[in-house]
Amino acid sequence: SGMKRPMHILEIGTFTGYSALCLAKGLGPNGKLHTIENRKEDADKAARYFAQSHNAHKIELHIGDAKEIIPTLPYKWDIVFIDADKTGYIEYYEMVVPLLATGGIIIADNVLFHGEVLEENISGKNAMAVHAFNEHVKNDPRTSQVLLTIRDGMLLIQKNEL
């Protein structure tokens, strides 16, 4: 995020807060990161880490269903990081593409799903959901994508200029 110096970052799936802390480091001077976690116990753990960070004032933690929370956040997002329930990736993507700022990007994590999405016969609901997401994004004329094959795979997605 430091390369873009974003003002508004949305993270879908906080878990322990590690990604949020990394993303918050690159925020612009008055930037804000909104992170959404559905599991209260994970959100509580992340909140403890956030409180220890010098960027705590730039991070707002939301607890609940991202599909309900996203529409309540009135921002154009410079960066959206999706790392939540794999079966929800397509719906999250469809929710945030219209909310991207000019030049904004979506980063989707775990898009290789342990290499399972590369197998000829994909099994398991999460692997099938990630494969469907990858195909959905690949075939979306609104965006351009780059797949980074590091670790478990990240998909960088940018909304095309119209």
Where are these regions (language model features)?
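S-adenosylmethionine/decaboxylated-SAM
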Residues: 1-162
